[in-house]
């Protein structure tokens, strides 16, 4: 149920669901080497939400049920609320029966991201990986999503890759990577006090009144 946030290359977290395997060392989920899991079981327990996920032609409910084909409408609505998607869905005349065009071309980038987060939540994963998946969402909504995660799914491990420090600063642990090496590990307060790279990114994003939304983080 802990959160560990990674601020560097997305390739690291792709080792967890075995999109590819590590050449050396081990990656463990629940203390078990991921290579010892049945691949289907592993990928049911790990959900990954990318910055640019895909929506399909069909209703909003159809798209959400790609996460769980047997999900009830009530379950879909609950997860949409956690992802702050319900608030804009309710503005559509047909609500959850609203038709989504192929690729989600008739919804905004932030709306698309929230729908794909809700879809991932329907899988009820043990590990939820958010790979820059709120980059198109405003900071206030991003904060609401993170608050809902803390309160409603505390038993799910969340691994967050983000462009904004505001998206990761309340995590249990933040991992700073530089050139593929661990440069720092700690809480937001600990890294602000001890880690030069984290301090630099934080200062660059807070200049001019603390508008995290206009400037990106470290790559």
Question: What are these language model-derived features?
Answer:
Residues 26-31, 36, 43, 61-102, ...:
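ABC ATPase nucleotide-binding domain helical subdomain, centered on the C-loop/LSGGQ "ABC signature"
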Residues 82, 91-95, 132, 140, ...:
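C-terminal portion of ABC ATPase nucleotide-binding domains
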Residues 1-6, 57, 161:
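Short, small-residue-biased leader/transition segments that mark boundaries at the very start
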